Amino acid sequence: MTKDSIKFVDTYHKKFFVADYDYFYDKFDVRVSFDCVEKIITNAFFDFQDCAGLGKEKKYKLDKTELGYELSTVEERAISRKIKKFYKKKRKNKDFMLVLQRILIDPEYFRPVKVSVEDLDEDMSVSVNYGAFKQFSEKNFPEKIVFQLAVGNNKTSLELKFLKIDFDVPLEPNFKISPKFKRIE
């Protein structure tokens, strides 16, 4: 991951992915930036609407649960032309969608342990789950991050496991992609 692109190689399945951040807008109508992805991966507090560049000030409802503190907000969001085409295929005519965002905060570390966004009218959601916190370079960090995307009965997940993490180290990506690998679209 660099400031201008995301690259990863799945050596087990012999696949690779390379794209700039506009890929997510072009494909899913979601604006994502390097700063947003960095916050998600480093387990910092983030808000999907801020990541999308909307930057609206919002009010959160706070609840104390047995798992921690839950912040939630519901807002009406205008639908772009791309998403309107999706709804028209489903024979629905919508101009707005209701979006519910929930953030579960761990009471011990005061860090997110789960962040989810749901379209309340449709069966669509995305979530990020952080688990197995442990010490890396004297910093508490999740050993595992699970991303889940659900659209109806189609569910996709990606699990990241961290074995070693070094902080504040200059880094330069230096991997090569074999010509035998298939590109993930």
Where are the regions that the model predicts?
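An acidic-aromatic
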Residues: 1-39
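Solvent-exposed coil/turn segments that connect beta secondary-structure elements
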Residues: 4-5, 11, 42, 76, ...
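Hydrophobic, well-structured mid-protein blocks that either form specific transmembrane helices
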Residues: 39-77
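Gly/Pro-enriched, hydrophobic low-complexity segments
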Residues: 61-179
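Compositionally biased, low-complexity linear motifs
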Residues: 20-24, 49-51, 58, 152-161
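Structural signature for solvent-exposed beta-strand/loop edge elements and short helix-capping sites
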Residues: 23, 28, 36-47, 59, ...
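Short, cationic low-complexity segments
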Residues: 180-185
